[in-house]
Amino acid sequence: MSRFSIEGKSLKLDAITTEDEKSVFAVLLEDDSVKEIVLSGNTIGTEAARWLSENIASKKDLEIAEFSDIFTGRVKDEIPEALRLLLQALLKCPKLHTVRLSDNAFGPTAQEPLIDFLSKHTPLEHLYLHNNGLGPQAGAKIARALQELAVNKKAKNAPPLRSIICGRNRLENGSMKEWAKTFQSHRLLHTVKMVQNGIRPEGIEHLLLEGLAYCQELKVLDLQDNTFTHLGSSALAIALKSWPNLRELGLNDCLLSARGAAAVVDAFSKLENIGLQTLRLQYNEIELDAVRTLKTVIDEKMPDLLFLELNGNRFSEEDDVVDEIREVFSTRGRGELDELDDMEELTDEEEEDEEEEAESQSPEPETSEEEKEDKELADELSKAHI
């Protein structure tokens, strides 16, 4: 595949006017059949973007644009125009299916060029928008642009969107209704990664039940470092059955909670032929009973599991179940459990609270208030129509 790259050269391109500057792009100028252009790791000003735009627009065979980290050191007023020029050129590339714009400090100021491009570029299949500082308002507008893209794709019978990588963008709960609509409108997605976006339980619930549960061809889902608690975990437990092709599930640092993790593991236990290859569950307050159930699920229903991450949870690396999980992998001749070197220990106060709760519940013949609340929540979630 013909590829042009100046990756990582740390060039400060304010304008491309001298012969030395143009010589850097000589190969690009000569190759009309180039399929991939990599500009990452350089800083591009407005006039340089104008020159590049004029020359990129003619590359009708271009398939991949790697434009991550191309505005370091640029003032916020300069970035929108430079971005607009580059994206206008990409709109003229009919085979361009992969666009990487990560690690650019767009913030809210550069949202308009993005919105215009994302709503119009129907060949798009793989979008990388990671660490762009969007915030919830700009994030919601980006989501609406992708909804418009779905309409335009359908009108042109264009290939479906397959990947959305949009992490570290402070999307928060405020944009989740729009993102849920986006996932409803792009139901053939294979990969969704929305890590570290400050999404809290109510937003997670909406995202899962009103959005991602509709994406039944999903293979990779990564929501690490958002906050689930029992509410979000219960929604995940419902949604799991919607993804029969899921191969990777990333839930590290999601605060599933003991009850939430138990609900997720219980949901796994009710599925058949689980094709997961990677399951990341670090730092989620998972307790021993849930791990025991998970071991049984892995043994009986996850024959393809290769990577399991459980560090930072509420059980000991000395517990028998840890050796039992490793024995399952050893017997198969494949599979790996991460190092359990940072396990969380319950404080004396937490242990006393749990003992008191258990003692107070055990003699009660009637349903406790907590159980009533759990049942009401389960009933409410079960009404969600997918």
Swiss-Prot record:
Gene Ontology cellular-component terms listed: cytoplasm; cytosol; nuclear periphery; nucleus; perinuclear region of cytoplasm
Protein name (database record): Ran GTPase-activating protein 1
Subunit structure as annotated in this protein's UniProt entry: Monomer.
Region (Disordered): 333-386
LRR repeats: 23-48, 85-112, 113-141, 179-206, 207-235, 236-264, 265-293, 294-322
Localization of this protein: Cytoplasm; Cytoplasm, Perinuclear region
Keyword annotations: Cytoplasm, GTPase activation, Leucine-rich repeat, Repeat
SUPFAM superfamilies: RNI-like (SSF52047)
InterPro entries hit by this protein: LRR_dom_sf (IPR032675), RanGap (IPR027038)
Basic and acidic residues bias: start-end ranges: 374-386
Residues at the site labelled Critical residue for GTP hydrolysis: R74
Sequence similarity: Belongs to the RNA1 family.
GO molecular function list: GTPase activator activity; small GTPase binding
SMART domains found in the cross-reference section: LRR_RI
Disulphide-bonded residues: none
Bias (Acidic residues): 338-359
Gene Ontology BP annotations: nuclear export; protein export from nucleus
Function: GTPase activator for the nuclear Ras-related regulatory protein spi1 (Ran), converting it to the putatively inactive GDP-bound state.
Species this protein is from: Schizosaccharomyces pombe (strain 972 / ATCC 24843) (Fission yeast)
Domain of life: Eukaryota
